[in-house]
Amino acid sequence: MQKFLLLLLTLLCLSCFQTERHCSDFKTGTFQFDYAVDGIEKTGTFVRTETLNIDYYENKVDSASVRWINDCEFIQKKINPKNKSEENAIHFKILSTTKDSYTFEYQLAVKDAFKKKRIEKGTAKKIK
């Protein structure tokens, strides 16, 4: 019985833990992120304003509009998509923050009935 109560108390304490998020600190700025292409690690940079996201990667520049849903979630849509798949908006959600970085997840903003739902995660570091 004591073990059960101890386990119950531990679970109760752990369930009250909430990840601290200061999402508004990461709404705008210059950020750096790592990604892999064919197993090769690369680093990209992006600049985000309240309404625009500009990506710099592999000597390319790409722009997207940004629409904030709340302090921790936004929808991003490419301004000049090059193909049909780039026309799809992406929903980003900041999961946790530290002093200079945040962890996020992203997925297609609109569900495609013919595709399996795919959620990816990443981390971005604020450099400016």
PLM features per residue range, with description:
Residues 33, 53-56, 74-78, 102-106:
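Short hydrophobic/aromatic-rich beta-strand segments that constitute the beta-sheet cores
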Residues 17-19:
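Bacterial signal peptide processing site
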Residues 80-128:
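Beta-sheet ligand-binding and adhesion/scaffold domains
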Residues 1-4:
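Positively charged n-region of N-terminal signal peptides that target proteins for export
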Residues 42-69:
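N-terminal glycine/threonine-rich, aromatic-flanked beta-hairpin/loop signature
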Residues 12-15:
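C-terminal motif of bacterial Sec signal peptides marking the signal peptidase cleavage site
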Residues 41, 46-48, 71-73, 83, ...:
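Surface-exposed, beta-sheet-biased, low-hydrophobicity segments with strongly acidic/polar composition
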Residues 23-39:
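Tryptophan-anchored aromatic micro-motifs
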